[in-house]
Amino acid sequence: MIDKKILQMHFSRNAKNYDAYAKVQKKMANTLLDMLDLDSKSRLDILDVGCGTGYLTKLLLDRWPDARITAIDIAPGMIEYARDRFNESNVEFACLDIEEAELNQKYDLVISNATFQWFNDLGGTVNKLVQSLKSDGVLAFSTFGHMTFSELHFSYETARRKLKIDEEFPPGQKFCNAKEILKICCETFEGLEGFEFDTVKKESLEYEYFYTVREFLDSVKKIGANNSNKQRKVNTALTKEMIRIYEEMFKVNGLVRATYHCIFITSRKKLAANTRRLVNAVV
């Protein structure tokens, strides 16, 4: 269970560091944008969920300068930092938890980069987002999959078994695999009567390299993405052994590796074929 207060604190206090360290997240934002196929001639209504510093918001504005963009984030520090970067009247920022917020507007595009892993109720949130789409609107998001930080999790479990520690408080966030995420999405889509969805999934692995494990862990903290689970405990002996194993197993040419498993999903909401026939008959 994600503790949202801890999450807010982590991201708020690291807003100024984020863009300097979030190299993978920036690459994901560009990949997600490249997957979109929307009419650039019309004025779009866009919701940017988990906008952070506004990096993706800026990409959206560059592509659709006339779009009306609502950018939201749970962290006040992120919203404050993002607001200072934009002067455009067609971009509005709000500090909101999307899992708690009510969406009273319909959007052509609901987009979210590297945020879905922080939701406690993924299915409920996906349902809320697709309900807010206009007909022919698109939900597009990227998130992290189960192979993310696989080196860290392997080293932690190996150290825990070696030291015979029964308690399980992993050092990093655990992530769903792509099949689980897609299944949740498809079950949600199937529950929306009168609509069908064209869905595309893409996966990739990205790697970062560091001189030490502590440098890697520090880089995660610098973007506020360290563990926000409740009941997080620190065992000094376990941490020390975990780092030793990590550097022994995953250090090549003087550098340790960290894996990011990136998942991208886009889905277009359309009137179902039988609904379209009914609409045409009425017309």
Swiss-Prot record:
Transferase keyword on record: yes
InterPro entries: BioC (IPR011814), Methyltransf_25 (IPR041698), SAM-dependent_MTases_sf (IPR029063)
Gene this chain is encoded by: bioC
Family: Belongs to the methyltransferase superfamily.
Any Pfam family matching the protein: Methyltransf_25
Protein keywords: Biotin biosynthesis, Methyltransferase, S-adenosyl-L-methionine, Transferase
Family annotation (Gene3D superfamilies): Vaccinia Virus protein VP39
EC code: 2.1.1.197
GO molecular function: carboxyl-O-methyltransferase activity; malonyl-CoA methyltransferase activity
PANTHER family for the chain: TRANS-ACONITATE 2-METHYLTRANSFERASE, TRANS-ACONITATE 2-METHYLTRANSFERASE-RELATED
Gene Ontology BP terms: biotin biosynthetic process; methylation
Enzyme class: transferase
CDD domains: AdoMet_MTases (cd02440)
SUPFAM superfamilies, per the entry: S-adenosyl-L-methionine-dependent methyltransferases
Function text: Converts the free carboxyl group of a malonyl-thioester to its methyl ester by transfer of a methyl group from S-adenosyl-L-methionine (SAM). It allows to synthesize pimeloyl-ACP via the fatty acid synthetic pathway.
Protein name stated in the entry: Malonyl-[acyl-carrier protein] O-methyltransferase
Pathway named in the protein's UniProt entry: Cofactor biosynthesis; biotin biosynthesis
Catalytic function, reaction form: malonyl-[ACP] + S-adenosyl-L-methionine = malonyl-[ACP] methyl ester + S-adenosyl-L-homocysteine
Highest taxon listed in the record's lineage: Bacteria
Nucleotide-binding listed as a keyword: no
